[in-house]
Amino acid sequence: MIKLKNFTELNSQEIELIFKWRNHPDINQFMKTKYIDFEEHLRFLKKLHQDSSKKYFLVFQDEQIIGVIDFVNITTKSCEFGLYAKPNLKGVGQILMNEIIKYAFENLKVNTLKAYVFKDNRKALKLYQQNHFTIYDEDKDFYHICLKQSDCKALPS
């Protein structure tokens, strides 16, 4: 069973765990901000209480923490998402992706789900394309991808 825990409800151990993951080289190599200090991390978590355009979740599978999913720039029409798995944990990308798609379309009720993917993050791009995301633009560093809810309704659940 999958459970989402909002970052605004994390306990002290979870706050520290997320901080360590966020600065782990396997994770931050594909982040725009490469390193954050603990004070910055705490400020970020505090700001989430007042910012309705962002939602971050710790993802549990059968009581085990498996990763993080997030939604930013949330509007009535669209949002951007991000995800990362627990360092050294393999095979959970699709589980995290399923939760992103479900939460965005069922809870946030957006029409379009978007992300920016580092061009050298082939693993992530493959996962997104397997989930019917399409590249709609690109720049020097990123592919811009999206999935429309109308495309998703035709997919098997």
Curated annotation (Swiss-Prot):
The keyword Transferase applies. Residues 5-152 form the N-acetyltransferase domain. Its EC number is 2.3.1.-. This is Acetyltransferase PseH. Catalyzes the third step in the biosynthesis of pseudaminic acid, a sialic-acid-like sugar that is used to modify flagellin. It comes from the Bacteria. The keyword Cell cycle does not apply. Keywords: Acyltransferase, Transferase. Signal peptide: none annotated. It comes from Campylobacter jejuni subsp. jejuni serotype O:23/36 (strain 81-176). InterPro entries: Acyl_CoA_acyltransferase, GNAT_dom, PseH. One of its GO terms (molecular function) is acyltransferase activity, transferring groups other than amino-acyl groups. The gene is pseH.
